[in-house]
Every structure is written in structure tokens, then in C-alpha cells.
Amino acid sequence: MFAQQPRSAPAPFYEKVKQAISEKIHSGVWRPHDRIPSEAELVAQFGFSRMTINRALRELTDEGLLVRLQGVGTFVAEPKGQSALFEVRSIAAEIVARHHQHRCEVLLLEETRADHIQATALSVPEGTRIFHSLMVHYENEVPVQIEDRCVNAAVVPDYLHQDYTATTPHDYLSLIAPLTEGEHIVEAVQATAEECALLHIHAHDPCLLIRRRTWSTTHIVSHARLLFPGSRYRLQGRFGS
């Protein structure tokens, strides 16, 4: 008489949903940036509870297969882009190199007086006349970076007069004040409520922050605060002797 083999436990319902969605993505039925059915439609399709469907979508988002945009829907994620950590490149150039479309939305472009933090970043006296810009960069209409930049007005006097929907601050600054030195500080941060809204992410979604300072000869040209959603971007650097 043979011993009866124990039966393996059936997969949880949310795992079945995850597997079905993953198969559609990996087989190419659903391609990057395709909008997938809504939670209500998936509930009707699978016959599972909304809580089960929500868990499946949440885990697939955490795994990088889906992107959920509040008030818009859930989309198939693009494979994560890479940003050069040690090489200073334009975000537009990185996106175009992946054969994707770049778009920039300019939120703020102003002349102001440097506060303590800005003055320290640019190594100028507090109250010095500077330029300040704030913009969001999109890759195939998905927000991938908030660029918050302050610029030394004495070094780049025409900064405010450029069309940054046609060129990037990086490209313009590289032309006017060629880069001779750069500094990167990278950290994991939690975005503010305003930043979450701009990036279409949830309150506790992880983000990567690069604080970048660039020099031309002996002058600090600009200090940029570059915020990336962690689920849509990764940094890659290479160095050697």
C-alpha cells in the first residue's frame, strides 16, 4: 500500500490574478503604456473581491510591472530607465536615447533673491540675485522627474529668456557655461504631497533624489534638485582608473 502524497495548497486568489496579468504583459498582449482594465472590470472578469484585485495590482506595481496613476488608471510599466550617476547628461537625451518621447512642463521661471539654502548651494551671499526654475519631465507622457533648479544670474544672465519646452536647462547651461566640474549627492527620500501630485504617485512611494551642483571654471553655475519616482527610474554609474 502506497503512502498518500500530501496535496499542495491552492494558490491564493490574488496570486492567480497576478499570474494572469503577468502572462498578458510578458506575452505582449498588453504592451508598455497600455491601460489595463479597471478594478471593477477585473472584479467582473475574475469573480474575486475588489480587495483581492487591489492586492494583486498593488503587488504588481511594487514589482515594477504596472504603474498606477491616481485618478487616471493602471498602465503597463515601461522597463525601468537608467540615469547616469557619474556622467552629467540631459534627461531629454536619456529619454530620446531609449527611442521615447520627452516632454517638459515648466511650472515656474523667476528671478528671486537667494535664501540661506540657495546661497549656500551656489556659494554666493544671501540675498544675491539668482534665477529659479521648476519643471516636470515626462517620458511618453509619464512623469519621471521633477527638476527644481537655482542658477547664478551673474554667470548666466539670459537664463529666464529660454524656451525650456524646446531645450532643457542642462543643454542651455552646457552651451553658455561649459561644465568643468560636477557634484552629485544621492539619497532616498519621501516626496511631499505636492511632489506626489506632480509625479502621480502615492504618499509613501519611495523616491530618489539627486542634488547636483555644476561648475564652469571657478564659478558654481547651478544647483539642481532632481526627484525621481523610485518605481520608474534607477541610477547607474561606472568609473575606473
Curated annotation (Swiss-Prot):
The keyword Methyltransferase belongs to this UniProt entry's keyword annotation: no
Pathway: Amino-acid degradation; L-histidine degradation into L-glutamate [regulation]
GO MF term set: DNA binding; DNA-binding transcription factor activity
Taxonomy, superkingdom: Bacteria
GO biological process terms held by the UniProt record: L-histidine catabolic process to glutamate and formamide; L-histidine catabolic process to glutamate and formate; negative regulation of DNA-templated transcription
Disulfide bonds listed in the record: none
CDD domains: WHTH_GntR
DNA-binding region of this protein: 39-58
Keyword terms, alphabetized: DNA-binding, Histidine metabolism, Repressor, Transcription, Transcription regulation
Residue stretches making up the HTH gntR-type domain: 11-79
Function per UniProt: Repressor which binds to the hutP region in the histidine utilization (hut) operon. It blocks the expression of all the hut genes in the absence of inducer.
Protein name: Histidine utilization repressor
Lineage per the UniProt record: Bacteria, Pseudomonadati, Pseudomonadota, Gammaproteobacteria, Enterobacterales
